């Protein structure tokens, strides 16, 4: 089924917390919930657990570069990621995440920081196809998901703003 990003965001928000469809707060005000930074690059920093991460991959039928980070201590067991061609793990919790995240199709690469991840993607791909859906709490890397999402957005614009013009209608 084809679903708009706004409808998809509402569906995810509804599944994670009680959402009143008549609420005065617009879905556009939900920070970093499937936010398209530039075409081909989605910021889902609001994803703070494996269930929301796996749901986003499935709903978007995502097969590009997945970036995850954060503290996996709240995840009771390991989980398998299906779909993405490449999984990138970065940050202070990358070793713990490597023990939790499994992937049959994907190569998993780890880096100490987001800059190195984005440099690797830019070097390898002719066009960006990125889902930043951490799937964990921020842990030691960021203050919260909003801080994390803003940082990701700034870095994407730093590394891919020259590609932006190629993807607008």
Language-model features, listed with the residues they occupy:
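ATP-dependent carboxylate-amine ligase
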Residues: 1-19, 25-169
